[in-house]
């Protein structure tokens, strides 16, 4: 199987439309194949190649997903984690990595103090001395400091571990060019082998989810989570600028893909998409 030529692998993705309709061309190809005296052996060979393509693609896809995740968890928990904890402990680094953490910590401590005063005023909490009140606030401040110390450590570990796992993923892609080619052909065959209605449904689902009317709220949550994941300041100007530009760029690329590729490969799917989107 390793000696098979790649031109035997099916890739119906980029068939260009010509003067003769594709349906007529496929009908003649089917008739020619049925009249071929060696058609039975060719069908068996095509089935064998298709089976090899499916097994190889699924195996490589599992490797691409599982191996970087395993490397990420192992490196983070057994190599990067202990090293970062040791460095942080013996260098007495500040609790906060950015101003956003400080603002959240101060707001949380302020809410705690205001809650105590409010409960004392309405009588749900017994009045305590100023010394006891300061002790409670101090204890809460220590808890908040421990929480944000853990968050800062976690962010540094995420940056290093994610960098390693991304490097491993890129290395797998670079070293597995043959497997990548087979996987790409396999995925193209699945996507472009869907019915026109299924294609149109997936297109509408994708566009409404990522570039639709409600997508800015989702993008805001995603960007804030990513910034917090890497310990970066949650700059509102950057978030709003990203939301204002990236979905528009994504929409432009998507429309170009429909015009440039999908319109040639499956014009009926494009027509179905426009009808469903109206």
UniProtKB/Swiss-Prot annotation:
Compartment annotation: Plastid, Chloroplast inner membrane
GO terms, molecular function: antiporter activity; proton transmembrane transporter activity
Positions in coiled-coil regions: none
Catalytic activity: K(+)(in) + H(+)(out) = K(+)(out) + H(+)(in)
Transmembrane segments: 61-81, 155-175, 203-223, 238-258
Keywords from the named record: Antiport, Chloroplast, Hydrogen ion transport, Ion transport, Membrane, Plastid, Plastid inner membrane, Potassium, Potassium transport, Transmembrane, Transmembrane helix, Transport
Superkingdom field: Eukaryota
GO cellular component, one term: chloroplast inner membrane
Membrane topology: Multi-pass membrane protein
InterPro entries xref list: CemA
BP term (GO), one: potassium ion transport
Entry function: Contributes to K(+)/H(+) antiport activity by supporting proton efflux to control proton extrusion and homeostasis in chloroplasts in a light-dependent manner to modulate photosynthesis. Prevents excessive induction of non-photochemical quenching (NPQ) under continuous-light conditions. Indirectly promotes efficient inorganic carbon uptake into chloroplasts.
Family the UniProt entry places it in: Belongs to the CemA family.
PANTHER family, per database record: CHLOROPLAST ENVELOPE MEMBRANE PROTEIN, CHLOROPLAST ENVELOPE MEMBRANE PROTEIN-RELATED
Protein name from the UniProt record: Potassium/proton antiporter CemA
């Amino acid at each position: 199987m390793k000696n098979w030529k790649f031109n035997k692998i099916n890739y119906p993705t980029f068939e260009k439309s010509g003067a003769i309709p594709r349906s007529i061309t496929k009908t003649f190809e089917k008739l020619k194949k049925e009249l071929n005296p060696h058609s039975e052996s060719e069908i068996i060979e095509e089935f064998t190649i298709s089976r090899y393509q499916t097994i190889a693609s699924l195996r490589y896809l599992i490797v691409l997903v599982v191996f970087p995740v395993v490397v990420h968890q192992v490196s983070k928990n057994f190599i990067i984690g202990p090293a970062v904890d040791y460095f942080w402990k013996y260098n007495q680094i500040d609790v906060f990595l950015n101003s956003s953490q400080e603002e959240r910590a101060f707001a949380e401590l302020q809410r705690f103090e205001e809650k105590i005063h409010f409960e004392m005023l309405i009588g749900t909490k017994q009045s305590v001395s100023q010394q006891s009140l300061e002790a409670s606030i101090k204890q809460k401040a220590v808890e908040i400091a421990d929480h944000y110390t853990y968050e800062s450590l976690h962010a540094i570990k995420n940056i290093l571990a994610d960098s390693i796992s991304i490097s491993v993923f890129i290395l797998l892609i670079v070293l597995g060019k043959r497997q990548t080619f087979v996987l790409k052909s396999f995925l193209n065959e699945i996507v472009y082998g869907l019915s026109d209605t299924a294609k149109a449904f997936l297109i509408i689902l994708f566009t409404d989810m990522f570039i639709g009317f409600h997508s800015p709220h989702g993008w805001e949550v995603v960007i804030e989570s990513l910034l917090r994941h890497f310990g970066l300041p949650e700059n509102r100007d950057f978030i709003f600028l990203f939301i204002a530009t990236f979905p528009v760029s994504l929409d432009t690329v998507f429309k170009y893909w429909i015009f440039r590729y999908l319109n040639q490969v499956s014009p009926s799917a494009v027509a179905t998409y426009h009808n469903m989107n109206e």
